[in-house]
């Protein structure tokens, strides 16, 4: 491992007179760093979808391009788990920045060499590599949150950070439009967001810090006098990969429950959003332009919903994440039913249902990652979150992309929505199995 990636060493503590001001300043600085950084990752995760119409003009089919699109999700799922283990033994300041920088380079190379976009196989390989580097984003952010924010405030703070998903994903469409207008080529779908991402990668290095102790500050639990009821022993000790995997992650049944819950939450998330333009135009009579606006509203509805969900889990459920997740998934169940059963010709109801799904679904998405952090020691936070992410993207996102299309082709939209409704129910069941975990949970 290169020295630059090693966890930053602890240094001598600051004087008590300087500690409070330094802690407040650095917490805000680090939070801004991982917020901007993760939003930057999203600029390079969904941009391929905007290139599909242009690549179709070159003779590629939807099936071929859908396979390339799935490469990102497949690679991301594996990478989030594997790179999560690596990130637990790395300095997130450089790990997060490196992943974004390398993802940007892949995007630039994708359109810099004409032979890349001449073959589905080569495009798949490049997007797989891009997805792998994308997996270096969430785990170091999760590790950073675990070190700089204590458990009783983490739900609210994490929900605010999670809005970076929506900011990065939502701003991509206008950035793509601007890039095409400026450079007069569809290839700007890749290189224009990549240039911005490279700039962001340097901002990450400027803003993010590893642990409070590496800045001369006490652990966050000591600073806020906010200790988990059943804290892990020696949680500031660096752990080996074997200890992380076999002592704290793979043998924790609650992590497995939320990993399975994540499969069904992600299936609903991507089964709705990735197919919304097609469903609205084919089944509900929307124009393509109107369906894009509906997509935009779906994404940005997730911002207040995510923040509210995190706040509820802290304020009303005392840092237990499952009750809030169950509550929001029950709401998703109702909204998906309305979205499905509302007759064509009622666009207002369709949009309200879609906005409601967006408002509600991102809360459970955020809470599962947060709950994984809560259920593991701080030094195993990246691996724990990586396990749930692996299940979400391999079992949920990639499955939604591939299976939804297959089912709709053979059983029409009713078949697809039966799968979405079933996924809502199964997500609720698996979340309910972790009802009392979180602040009150004991390690199993």
From Swiss-Prot:
The chain crosses the membrane at residues 37-57, 64-84, 94-112, 121-141, 161-180, 190-207, 262-282, 288-308, 322-341, 347-368, 388-409, 415-435. One of its GO terms (cellular component) is plasma membrane. Residues 1-36, 85-93, 142-160, 208-261, 309-321, 369-387, 436-444 are cytoplasmic. InterPro entries: G3P_transporter, MFS, MFS_dom, MFS_trans_sf, OPA_Antiporter, Sugar-P_transporter_CS, Sugar_P_transporter. It holds the Pfam family MFS_1. GO terms for molecular function: glucose 6-phosphate:phosphate antiporter activity; glycerol-3-phosphate transmembrane transporter activity. It is found in: Cell membrane. Keywords: Cell membrane, Glycerol metabolism, Membrane, Transmembrane, Transmembrane helix, Transport. Residues 58-63, 113-120, 181-189, 283-287, 342-346, 410-414 are extracellular. It is a multi-pass membrane protein. GO terms for biological process: glucose-6-phosphate transport; glycerol metabolic process; phosphate ion transmembrane transport. Responsible for glycerol-3-phosphate uptake. Belongs to the major facilitator superfamily. Organophosphate:Pi antiporter (OPA) (TC 2.A.1.4) family. PANTHER family: GLUCOSE-6-PHOSPHATE EXCHANGER SLC37A4, GLYCEROL-3-PHOSPHATE TRANSPORTER. This is Glycerol-3-phosphate transporter. The gene is glpT.
């Amino acid at each position: 491992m290169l020295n630059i990636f090693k966890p930053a060493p602890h240094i001598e503590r600051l004087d008590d007179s300087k500690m409070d001001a330094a802690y407040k300043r650095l917490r805000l600085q680090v939070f801004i760093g991982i917020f901007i950084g993760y939003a930057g990752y999203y600029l390079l995760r969904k941009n391929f979808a905007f290139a599909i119409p242009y690549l179709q003009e070159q003779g590629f089919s939807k099936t071929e391009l859908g396979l390339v699109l799935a490469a990102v999700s497949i690679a991301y799922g594996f990478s989030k788990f594997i790179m999560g283990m690596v990130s637990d033994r790395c300095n997130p300041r450089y790990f997060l920045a490196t992943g974004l920088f390398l993802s940007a380079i892949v995007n630039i190379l994708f359109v810099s060499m004409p032979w890349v976009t001449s073959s589905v196989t080569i495009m798949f390989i490049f997007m797989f590599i891009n997805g792998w580097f994308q997996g270096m984003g969430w785990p170091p952010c999760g590790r950073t949150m675990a070190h700089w924010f204590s458990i009783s405030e983490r739900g609210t703070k994490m929900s605010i950070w999670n809005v970076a998903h929506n900011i990065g994903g939502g701003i991509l469409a206008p950035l793509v439009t601007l890039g095409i207008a400026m450079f007069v080529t569809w290839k700007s779908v890749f290189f224009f967001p990549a240039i911005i991402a490279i700039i962001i990668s340097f901002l990450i290095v400027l803003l993010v810090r590893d642990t409070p102790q590496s800045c001369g500050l006490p652990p966050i639990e000591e600073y806020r006098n906010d200790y988990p009821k059943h804290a892990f022993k020696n949680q500031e000790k660096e752990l080996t990969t074997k200890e992380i995997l076999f002592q704290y992650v793979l043998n924790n049944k609650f992590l497995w429950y939320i990993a399975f819950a994540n499969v069904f939450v992600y299936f609903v998330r991507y089964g709705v959003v990735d197919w919304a333009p097609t469903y609205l135009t084919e089944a509900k009579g929307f124009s393509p332009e109107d369906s894009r606006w509906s997509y935009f509203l779906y994404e940005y509805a997730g911002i207040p919903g995510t923040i509210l969900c995190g706040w509820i889990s802290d304020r009303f459920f005392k840092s237990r994440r499952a009750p809030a997740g169950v509550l929001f998934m029950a709401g998703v169940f109702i909204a998906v039913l309305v979205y499905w059963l509302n007759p064509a010709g009622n666009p207002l109801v369709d949009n309200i249902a879609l906005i409601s799904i967006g408002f509600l679904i991102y809360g459970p998405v955020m809470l599962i990652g947060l709950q994984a952090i809560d259920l593991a020691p701080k030094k195993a936070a990246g691996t724990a979150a990586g396990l749930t992410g692996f299940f979400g993207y391999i079992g949920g996102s990639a499955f939604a992309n591939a299976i939804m299309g297959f089912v709709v082709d053979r059983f029409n939209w009713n078949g697809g929505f039966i799968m979405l409704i079933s996924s809502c129910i199964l997500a609720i069941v698996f979340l309910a199995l972790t009802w009392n975990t979180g602040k009150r949970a004991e390690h199993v």
